[in-house]
């Protein structure tokens, strides 16, 4: 299911995830059988591939700031509920971007009381918060840039869908200091095989 990025566009209907599991699970299994042989050894992992992960892990594990994980998580939840709900406007999103930026700065001052490596729920929750905060930042910043309404993004200042200017995927990069870089990618409207026909995008009207 996690492999079905953008298959359903801006708003996936709930039960369609079953199709994702069947289709993409089959594709993943076929690709794995093509690239891996039973009993085949894996090449050694480059140290550079793991050092960045370990540095982040140890930095968070040994954090000795002034703000608790629970406090930061609650601030993030409230900010997203208030400023990144389905119905948004520019003023609300602008304020949300600022608040999430402040919370990201506060994350540098997080406090862990337990530095052990055994059953350390404090560490697990802080690592999870770091991941959630990254997702929250790119979500609200992407929404703030998209000047239209599409799928689950209902922008009250731009109530109509705008295929001419916004028929594109938002791509966001986030660095270790919570600085983001915004980009876009064209939507592929053709299928990758001749088994099915392409379906032209149309407005979803209820």
Please report, for each region that a protein language model flagged, where it lies by residue:
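Glycine- and aromatic-enriched mobile tails/lids
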Residues: 2-206
């Amino acid at each position: 299911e996690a492999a079905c990025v953008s298959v359903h566009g801006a708003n996936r209907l709930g039960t369609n995830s079953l199709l994702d599991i069947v289709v993409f699970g089959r594709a993943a299994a076929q690709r794995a059988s093509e690239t891996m042989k039973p009993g085949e050894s894996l090449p050694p992992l480059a140290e550079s591939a793991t050092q960045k992960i370990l540095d982040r892990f140890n930095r968070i594990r040994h954090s000795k700031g002034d703000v608790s994980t629970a406090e930061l998580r609650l601030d993030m939840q409230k900010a997203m509920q208030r400023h990144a709900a389905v119905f948004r406007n520019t003023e609300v999103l602008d304020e949300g971007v600022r608040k999430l930026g402040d919370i990201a700065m506060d994350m540098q001052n997080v406090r862990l009381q337990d530095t052990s490596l055994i059953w350390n729920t404090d560490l697990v929750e802080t690592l999870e918060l770091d991941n959630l905060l990254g997702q929250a930042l790119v979500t609200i910043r992407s929404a703030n840039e998209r000047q239209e309404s599409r799928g689950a993004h209902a922008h009250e200042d731009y109530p109509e869908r705008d295929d001419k200017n916004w028929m594109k995927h938002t791509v966001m990069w986030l660095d270790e200091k919570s600085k983001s870089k915004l980009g876009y990618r064209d939507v592929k409207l053709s299928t990758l095989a001749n088994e099915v026909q392409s379906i032209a995008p149309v407005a979803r009207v209820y």
